[in-house]
């Protein structure tokens, strides 16, 4: 009997130890949206593929090591290439993340996402998630069937980042190819290279190495719990478009922006957000119609500054500061849910 009691006691202790280990690991939930990380190709050596084909359960099976660092669960939100990302999916993601964090039993979120518009989704969530818990976007430049696919290690590093206590309060981040990049500054810089995501204006926040995160800095821009924007009761976003400037641009490219219900226009200008003489009268007309105009630049680095070659105060234009056109569009959409005062919107661009 004594032997049986000892065996029972040992078994009970083993069960308790196992449950304690599970309980001590953070709970990480993965929201899958598709993209190259879930893509399949006809050949392991070719770059052509179909995005968004692999389910999240299959992706996790390829990286069993994540279960050693976290209790990982997942759900499929959509299965799309991120070139088809849209406002409806953004709103779904933001609301779902806020719902998960409100429950109290989720410690971090990982979002698998295509790289084409990842920086836009990350920035949108950076402004609409209402928690200081980690939200990490991750993708791949090579499909899951490719020789030397980058997705599995990227996914592992993303879970490591989301599970780390040090990641709290950093805002929404992108974890790609070993780097941890803040949503404000991250951008895709190469069409095919695995080291495509960089933060050329500010640098990476940190990196992941051997299953550990190392942070060197954090963003001073407002985000997440410090954000003014709330999408809880929104089912759509204001209509905002981007008009691209180039040599000999014709004024008629502005016609749809003036006639099709746009509430805001981001001008992707040359140099420091400069505007071609053919477009200037059309942008003035937009302001007269109550359409907000933000000046950004097609140049990948450097800010678009107030009152450089354009008198923004005179024309009531907003300068995007360090935000590229696609991110300026995101902030303008959210700003328009709060106000149409161009001066207040300029304040938003100064701090976000």
What are these model-predicted stretches?
Residues 111-133, 275-284:
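Short Gly/Thr/Asp-enriched flexible loops that form oxyanion-binding sites at enzyme active sites
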Residues 25, 31, 55, 59-66, ...:
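Accessory alpha-helical/coil subdomains and C-terminal extensions
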């Amino acid at each position: 009997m004594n032997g049986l009691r000892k065996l029972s006691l040992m078994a009970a202790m083993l069960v308790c130890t196992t449950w304690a280990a599970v309980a001590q690991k953070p709970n990480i939930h993965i929201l899958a949206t598709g993209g190259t990380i879930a893509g399949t190709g006809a050949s392991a050596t070719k770059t052509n593929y179909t995005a968004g084909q692999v389910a999240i359960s299959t992706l996790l099976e390829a990286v069993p090591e994540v279960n050693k660092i976290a209790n990982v669960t997942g759900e499929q939100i959509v299965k799309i290439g991120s070139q088809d990302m849209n406002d409806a999916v953004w709103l779904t993601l933001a609301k779902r993340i806020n719902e998960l964090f409100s429950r109290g039993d989720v410690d971090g979120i990982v979002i698998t996402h295509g790289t084409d518009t990842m920086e836009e989704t990350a920035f949108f969530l950076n402004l609409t998630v209402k928690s200081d818990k980690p939200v990490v976007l991750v993708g791949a430049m090579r499909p899951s069937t490719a020789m030397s696919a980058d997705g599995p290690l990227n996914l592992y590093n993303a879970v490591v980042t989301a599970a780390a206590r040090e990641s709290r309060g950093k805002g929404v981040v992108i974890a790609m190819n070993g780097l941890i990049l803040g949503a404000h500054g991250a951008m895709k810089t190469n069409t095919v290279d695995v080291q495509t995501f960089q933060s050329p204006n500010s640098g990476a926040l940190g990196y992941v190495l051997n299953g550990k995160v190392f942070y060197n800095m954090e963003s001073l821009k407002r985000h997440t719990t410090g954000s003014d924007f709330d999408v809880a009761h929104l089912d759509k976003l204001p209509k905002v478009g981007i008009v691209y400037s180039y040599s000999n641009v014709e004024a008629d490219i502005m016609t749809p922006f003036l006639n099709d219900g746009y509430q805001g226009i981001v001008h992707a200008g040359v140099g420091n957000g400069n505007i071609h003489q053919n477009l200037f009268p059309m942008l003035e007309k937009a302001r007269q119609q109550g359409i907000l105009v933000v000046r950004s630049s097609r140049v990948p680095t450097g800010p678009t500054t107030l009152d450089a070659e354009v008198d923004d105060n005179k024309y009531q234009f907003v300068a995007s500061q360090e935000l590229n056109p696609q991110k300026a569009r995101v902030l303008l959409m959210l700003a328009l849910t709060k106000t149409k005062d161009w001066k207040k919107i300029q304040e938003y661009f100064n701090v976000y």
